[in-house]
A protein has these predicted regions:
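Secretory targeting and sorting signals
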Residues: 1-42
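A ubiquitous, low-specificity "background" feature that marks scattered single residues
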Residues: 8-14, 33, 108-110, 176, ...
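Generic secondary-structure transition motif, activating predominantly at the C-termini of alpha-helices
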Residues: 4-9, 79, 299, 342, ...
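Surface-exposed intrinsically disordered loops and tails
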Residues: 242-244, 300-307
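N-terminal onset of structured domains
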Residues: 294-295, 303
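Chitinase-like catalytic core of GlcNAc-active glycosidases
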Residues: 45-271, 276-293, 310-316, 326-338, ...
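Residues that scaffold, gate, or flank divalent-cation-dependent active/transport sites
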Residues: 323
């Protein structure tokens, strides 16, 4: 996902409030215990900020904390068709595994509190707002116990400070499934099942269960909300039938999603990630109608291309787009079609 910024004032940098969860000693003990023993180490601390459940069929959209020439969009202006908004992106620090968030002044907020109030308003309307980590330019390294703990602690701190409902993993420069699993287990142990936890791997990352991303998804499937694979900016890939498919078609979406659906993930944990407009990705754009056809094919066995799944998956979670800003740039041509269709799935 392209988070290249246009020239302008840099966002104000601020260290994450790593002890914002309460007593510093208590927060450190919680994280250390969770990382050492996993999510079952103790009782969760209770519901997170949003507490509302993600709908059975949901639409995820990435929101730009930067200006890349699409549309500068306030969080409040994201359409209600989106059930999960992934704020893009958190920033890395000099501490391995640690993240922080720096609101870009180009967005025009008069204060950070105004931004936080818009998060709360979205949540009050039933939308989950999460912090996304990674993107094309973002690189957060979690590859040992110390960096795993730093990721857990700093993510929980951002959730506490801004009210985020959870976290999205969009790391595109390689991950270590072992230690990122530990980090996510620590976050889940602290927040409980109110956590909204999404992933946006690239197509190559979900071709085989032996890949690090697929392993992370399977390791954390007990609390994973949805994997929205990016079915764009991709070369040809194998489908679950062993045939080769090219991006930009209904078959690419359905045949590749079938791999996840038949390899251990629950259908409710699988979503279709696509660009909102031709400008939003270098390649792989499909029309909103193609997205709805793919959804119908996988959930009901209708409107398929040449690939027809052996069975249907009525609980398929839905669709994702990069991004709400590019959607706005195209007059909401994507969300106005895909959103109602997802929400009307049986």
């Amino acid at each position: 996902m392209d988070n290249t910024r246009t020239a302008g004032a840099p966002p104000t940098r601020r260290r994450p409030l790593t002890l914002a969860l309460g007593s510093g000693a208590l927060a450190a003990l919680l994280v250390t215990t969770a990382l050492a023993t996993g999510a079952g180490a103790g009782e969760p601390s209770g519901p997170g900020p949003g507490t509302q459940a993600v709908p059975r069929h949901a639409v995820t959209g990435y929101w730009h904390n930067f200006d890349n020439g699409s549309v500068i969009q306030r969080l409040a202006d994201v359409p209600d068709d989106f059930d999960i908004i992934a704020v893009s992106f958190a920033d890395s620090t000099t501490v391995p595994g640690e993240i922080e968030f720096n609101l870009d002044p180009v967005l025009g907020y008069t204060s950070e509190q105004q931004f936080k109030d818009e998060i709360a308003a979205k949540q009050a309307a039933g939308t989950s707002v999460i912090i996304s980590v990674g993107g094309e330019l973002g690189n957060v390294t979690v590859n040992d116990p110390a960096s795993a703990q730093a990721f857990t602690t700093s993510t929980l701190a951002l959730m506490d400070e801004y009210g985020f409902d959870g976290v999205d993993i969009d790391l595109e420069h390689g991950i270590n499934a072992t230690y990122l699993t530990q980090a996510m287990e620590g976050i889940h142990a602290a927040t409980g099942d109110s956590l909204v936890y999404t992933m946006a791997p690239q197509t190559i990352d979900m071709q085989s269960t032996s890949s690090q991303y697929f392993q992370l998804a399977l390791n954390t499937k007990d609390f994973l909300t949805v994997v929205n694979t990016q079915y764009y900016n991709s070369g040809t890939m194998l489908g679950c039938d062993g045939q080769v498919y090219a991006a930009g078609s209904v078959d690419f979406l359905t045949a590749l999603a079938c791999i996840q659906l038949e390899s251990g993930l629950d259908p409710s944990q699988v979503g279709l990630g696509v660009p909102a407009s031709p400008n939003a990705a270098g390649s792989g754009y499909v029309s909103p109608q193609t997205v709805t056809d793919a959804l119908d094919c996988l959930t009901q066995g209708t409107n398929c291309g040449t690939f027809v799944p052996d069975r249907t998956y009525p609980d398929l979670r839905g669709a994702m787009t990069w991004s709400t800003n590019w959607d706005a740039h195209s007059g909401y041509a994507w969300s106005s079609v895909v959103g109602p269709h997802v929400h009307a799935l049986p």
